[in-house]
Regions:
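Conserved N-terminal entry element of GNAT/NAT acetyltransferase domains
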Residues: 1-32, 39, 43, 183, ...
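Acetyl-CoA-dependent GNAT
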Residues: 28-32, 38-39, 43-116, 127-129, ...
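Amphipathic alpha-helical recognition patches that constitute DNA-binding helices
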Residues: 36, 107, 142, 153
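Short hydrophobic/aromatic beta-strand or adjacent loop that forms the aromatic wall/cage
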Residues: 77, 180-184
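Conserved glycine-rich acetyl-CoA-binding loop
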Residues: 101, 110, 114-128, 137, ...
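Conserved GNAT acetyl-CoA-binding A-motif
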Residues: 134-146
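Conserved catalytic-core motifs of GNAT/GCN5-like acyltransferases
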Residues: 144-147, 159, 164-180
């Protein structure tokens, strides 16, 4: 097995800056993580404006205590973080609707990994954690997500995780006067 593949299998990742290997830990976030989550979320919205709905201005106006509420795990929402030591380097969320007829479905949202940590299978580990949570904690049998038409890397990642495109919403988002389509993807768990 290639050393990088072996490290990824052991949950270790290394930033692409050539620094020594780091151990990446994936865990459920809570209110205590609000400040570091907010910092990563603002970087995500700033560096990938076509991948996130809020603008940087809109998201930067959200106070830390509101992020704390959003991060508190419930029966309908959970957010996971990837940590290099104490530093949050990646995030994703999963939510579902508790109404009985659609409680079997959950939606993955907000997948982001800091640029220096990409290519180390961290996004896959975050998706695995969110998927396991939806299946095991909530009994979900189906996951959905959306990906912007220009984010080919993310779409390939989602396809490699078993997601299949099932539809496209034309002109779903307008960024700086340009319209973008959103692809809807689904994964059946059971």
């Amino acid at each position: 097995m290639h050393p990088a593949t072996a490290a990824a299998a052991r949950g270790q990742a290394r930033p692409s800056t050539g620094t020594p290997p780091m151990t990446i830990t994936i865990r459920l976030l809570d209110a205590a993580d609000a400040a570091c989550f907010r910092a990563v979320r603002l970087r995500a919205v700033d560096t990938a404006p076509t991948s996130f709905l809020p603008t940087l201005d809109e998201e930067s106006q959200v106070p830390v205590d509101e992020f704390a509420k959003r991060l508190t795990p419930t029966q309908v929402q959970a957010v996971f973080g990837a940590f290099d030591g104490e530093t949050l380097v990646g995030i994703t969320g999963v939510r579902r609707d508790a109404r009985t007829k659609i409680a079997h479905k959950a939606t993955i949202w907000g997948v982001y990994v800091d640029a220096a940590y990409r290519g180390q299978r961290i996004a896959q580990a975050l998706l695995d954690s969110a998927t396991a949570h939806a299946a095991n904690a909530w009994g979900c049998s189906q996951l959905m997500l959306c990906v912007n038409e220009v984010n080919h890397t993310a779409e390939r990642l989602y396809a490699s995780q078993g997601f299949v495109r099932f539809g496209t919403e034309p002109r779903s988002m307008c960024v700086d006067g340009r319209f973008y389509d959103e692809h809807y993807m689904i994964k059946t768990l059971a």
